[in-house]
């Protein structure tokens, strides 16, 4: 009888271990940006030197806000993000804010989701996260440009 009890305990512990194995394994680049995200926060969206991009993916529910602060020479001097989503979305936001800092508006506009996906080594099922980051950058740049046009018009 004790042999049956011991075997049953062993089987249960092995089943628990199998059930706790993660379904998806993330590359260390994703894990690093997820566990230690860079540039989390917000900038003052009323500031004319700040562009704000807010994008979402209805299919998965990810929402990403990315903001840039641009100096008088057209150089991005700061970037912040807030993302509600999976680890890949957070990592994509974090990497995107790192990459746009120090770039001109034109250079930042050339950043592609494929660059983000390649750096993070995102699997095909997570490519939409890097697309969201690209869309958020483009939306932030567009918002900044609209503010600048309004400033010149006044």
Curated annotation (Swiss-Prot):
Cofactor binding note from Swiss-Prot or TrEMBL: Fe(2+) binding protein that acts as a scaffold for the assembly of iron-sulfur clusters. Binds 1 [2Fe-2S] cluster per subunit.
One GO MF term attached to the UniProt entry: 2 iron, 2 sulfur cluster binding
Keyword Iron-sulfur: yes
UniProt cross-references to Pfam families, sorted A to Z: NifU_N
GO cellular component: cytoplasm; mitochondrial [2Fe-2S] assembly complex; mitochondrial matrix
Listed cofactors: Fe(2+); [2Fe-2S] cluster
GO terms of biological process kind: [2Fe-2S] cluster assembly; intracellular iron ion homeostasis; positive regulation of mitochondrial electron transport, NADH to ubiquinone
Pathway connected to this protein: Cofactor biosynthesis; iron-sulfur cluster biosynthesis
Its job: Scaffold protein for the de novo synthesis of iron-sulfur (Fe-S) clusters within mitochondria, which is required for maturation of both mitochondrial and cytoplasmic [2Fe-2S] and [4Fe-4S] proteins. Component of the mitochondrial core iron-sulfur cluster (ISC) assembly complex; regulates its activity.
Family (UniProt): Belongs to the NifU family.
Protein name per Swiss-Prot or TrEMBL: Iron-sulfur cluster assembly enzyme IscU
Origin species: Drosophila melanogaster
